[in-house]
Amino acid sequence: SVTGEAGKLVTDIRTGVALVANSTLTINTTLNGDFTDHAIYLNDFTGGTTENNLIDITNASAEKYYIFRISRDATAGTKTINFAGSGRTFNRSWLTGTLAIGVSQTWVLMVRATSATNFDVIAQRVV
């Protein structure tokens, strides 16, 4: 965790908040830590099963940023990520459907809250 003075950037790197296979990971910005500016989550897909995972963010506020680094090992199976939540809109950089994480790939998903219920999502593959 890196913390600055008042008005400065505060970043918290979280490794304890994990993706759950074929389920929704809900990031409650109140319960999962006080992320004043940024939160970074490190997640890994391992094993050979098919996983379709959702990420939801609750109790957000405008101009807060959430970064997800998602890696995948070399085992077989389909691994996908999407964002969804009741009453929340996630404007994704991919056009439709889910983001497939290919074998041995790492992706960074950057999420900016434009309000408590609206988010911009950008996905970038790390090469």
Named regions from a protein language model:
Residues V2-S86, A113-V127:
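Exposed extracellular interaction/assembly regions and N-terminal maturation sites
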